[in-house]
């Protein structure tokens, strides 16, 4: 087995990064370096699943990403509540005719549900047709 000193992981699946980091920090002398999510011109995070989408579906996913970026800005400025996020989730589903598994804000440090005056991250999993996309902002 190898014993690396450093591991580089993308933030695209932030929940996975969080759990792996927690596990590794307890068991190994390995430093995890989070790497920013790479996005296309429409703010859609790059993923191998994007190849399963048609041009129109990619455009739709990009519009959804732009909507979520605006929602994240509102979260920072207006201290959105969980109830407001639930309302936005319903708006998003209706506007883009998509199924959403989850749309929620969580504390970056411990993944607890939305907390005021803390560093929160918006998490989403949704479907464009049959392709499930995940992201966080």
What kind of region is each of these model predictions?
Residues 1-98, 106, 110, 130, ...:
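Nucleotidyltransferase catalytic core that binds NTPs
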């Amino acid at each position: 087995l190898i014993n690396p000193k450093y591991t580089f992981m993308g933030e695209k699946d932030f929940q996975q990064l969080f759990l792996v980091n927690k596990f590794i920090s307890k068991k190994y002398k390995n430093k995890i370096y989070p790497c920013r999510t790479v996005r296309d011109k429409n703010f859609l995070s790059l993923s191998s699943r994007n190849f399963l989408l048609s041009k129109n579906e990619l455009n739709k996913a990009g519009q959804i990403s732009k909507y979520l970026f605006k929602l994240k800005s509102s979260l920072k400025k207006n201290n959105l509540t969980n109830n407001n996020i639930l309302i936005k989730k319903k708006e998003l589903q209706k506007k883009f005719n998509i199924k959403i598994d989850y749309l929620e804000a969580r504390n970056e440090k411990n993944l607890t549900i939305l907390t005021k005056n803390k560093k929160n991250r918006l998490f989403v999993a949704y479907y464009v047709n049959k392709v499930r996309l995940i992201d966080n902002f």
